[in-house]
Regions:
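Preference for extracellular/luminal or secreted protein segments
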Residues: 22-35, 39-43, 48, 80, ...
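Alpha-helical scaffolding segments of alpha/beta enzyme cores, especially the outer helices
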Residues: 90, 151-158, 207-210, 246-258, ...
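Short beta-strand/loop segments at the ligand-binding rim of alpha/beta enzyme cores
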Residues: 98, 165, 263-266, 345-355
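Bacterial N-terminal signal peptides that target proteins for export
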Residues: 1-8
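C-terminal motif of bacterial Sec signal peptides marking the signal peptidase cleavage site
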Residues: 17-21
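Phosphate/pyrophosphate-binding betaalpha-module
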Residues: 251-268, 294, 298-311
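Enzymes and membrane/adaptor proteins characterized by extended Gly/Ser/Thr/Asp/Glu-rich
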Residues: 110-114, 125-248, 270, 275-289, ...
Length: 433
């Protein structure tokens, strides 16, 4: 019943509403208002998602800076060890400039104060201390007997702090100072042995050297390296080893070996070749008319061979090689330095021919000395006035015309040769075989 009542109560309002509508059909049925749409709630803006804060990148830990490796300290460059001075340098250091210049001069004994041609007297002994010459040249006028000559050469050397050269001009035959006075060796001029070959040339060189040493000489102005290529030549002729350039070259080289075996220094002469001339340089100017190229192919062959065999000195002839220089060869830088030293490679001592010869009559001793040394000469043979020659060289050094280095070069060559001289003499006195 209860359920029925509830149902009736619910239907009554519906009935009433239906009746009212049927009784007033014309009445405007008021518009049933559209039910107001429940306004949609304003959309709540979706909040932008709060961006996750970008995490600050965890900074890479700053690496500790790798310490720069401590550089190894740059070692100071090891200085090149200062070379020990050579024996000749030690000798040179003890010499004043003037004493060095005297080493570049060869005297005749008569040039000394109170000069005596046969024995050293007291005045000469004192003068040797004031003028310590590089050497002495003895000629036939200094030779009277074997005992006298031995004493003379011994006493000339005895007063010298640096042993002097004791030189002779001993070729055999035409130029035979010892053989024509006190010696026992009688050789003919070398040309006569040319067809007996190199062994004979070597033997003759050794024989000459041994006789020279017997009388106190330590250097010879031989062998002759000129070639007798001009039949009209009057000054060389039979003194030459040959009239053929190649043969002369072989014989001269063998002779150099012979001189050394006998214990004596030797000298090639007369550079650049006196065998194709006609005049005699003892009396005046002598001209060589060959070109330099012709000299290389001819006259220079024996000089080249002798140098390669170890010759100690080369003598510059009083010759004018007009294709190269209008002055005598000893004043020619082109001949002495460029040709002889640089082209032929000669490292020994360059010596002049005797400065008293007629070919140099128009030059003073001072001029000759300075011009020759500037050209490359080391040793002045027998100037007429040795004191004037040394004075001129000293003045040229003080004025800067000659450098002290240039003088030093020559003196070192001379001292080196003297040390070699001692070695040769020792070897000859005590042959290994």
């Amino acid at each position: 019943m209860k359920l029925l009542r509830i149902l009736i109560l619910l239907l009554i309002p519906v009935f009433l509403l239906t009746t009212a509508a049927c009784g007033n059909e014309t009445a405007e049925t008021p518009p049933i208002p559209e039910p107001s749409a429940t306004p949609a709630p304003a959309p709540v803006p979706t909040p932008e998602p709060t961006p996750e804060p970008t995490p600050e990148p965890t900074p890479e830990p700053t690496p500790e800076p790798t310490p720069e490796p401590t550089p190894e300290p740059t070692p100071e460059p090891t200085p090149e060890p200062t070379p020990e001075p050579t024996p000749e340098e030690l000798l040179l250091e003890g010499l004043s400039l003037r004493e060095q210049l005297w080493q570049m001069v060869v005297l005749r004994p008569a040039n000394l104060q109170g000069g005596n041609n046969l024995a050293v007297n007291e005045a000469m002994g004192e003068d040797l201390l004031a003028r310590p010459a590089g050497g002495f040249y003895l000629d036939a006028e200094n030779m009277r007997s074997a005992d006298q000559l031995r004493a003379f050469t011994r006493d000339l050397a005895a007063g010298m702090a640096i042993p002097p050269l004791i030189l002779c001009d001993e070729e055999g035959g035409v130029v035979d100072r010892l053989g024509n006075t006190v010696g026992s060796l009688k050789l003919r001029s070398m040309y006569h042995y040319k067809d007996q070959g190199e062994d004979k040339a070597r033997e003759n060189g050794e024989l000459l050297a041994r006789e020279l040493r017997e009388f106190g000489f330590n250097a010879d102005l031989a062998p002759v390296a000129d070639v007798w290529s001009n039949p009209a030549n009057t000054v060389i002729r039979y003194r030459a080893y040959s009239d053929d350039f190649s043969q002369a070259a072989r014989l001269v080289a063998a002779a150099v070996e012979g001189f050394h075996s006998g214990g004596v220094l030797c000298t090639l002469k007369h550079f650049p070749g006196h065998g194709d001339t006609q005049a005699d340089s003892h009396y005046g100017a002598v001209y060589v008319t060959r070109s330099l190229e012709e000299l290389r192919e001819r006259e220079l062959l024996p000089f080249r061979a002798g140098i390669e065999a170890g010759a100690d000195m080369v003598m510059i002839g009083h010759l004018i090689v007009s294709s190269v220089d209008e002055e005598p060869a000893l004043f020619s830088y082109a001949l002495v330095t460029e040709l002889l030293r640089e082209e032929l490679g000669f490292q020994g001592v360059v010596i002049t021919d005797a400065l008293q010869m007629g070919a140099l009559g128009s030059y003073t001793d001072g001029e000759t000395a300075v011009k020759a040394v500037l050209a490359g000469v080391d040793l002045l043979l027998c100037p007429r006035d040795p004191e004037a020659a040394v004075d001129a060289l000293e003045a040229a050094a003080e004025e800067g015309i000659l450098t002290e280095e240039r003088i030093r070069e020559s003196v070192l060559r001379i001292l080196r040769m003297k040390l070699e001289m001692a070695r040769l003499q020792e070897a000859a006195a005590c042959p290994s075989d």
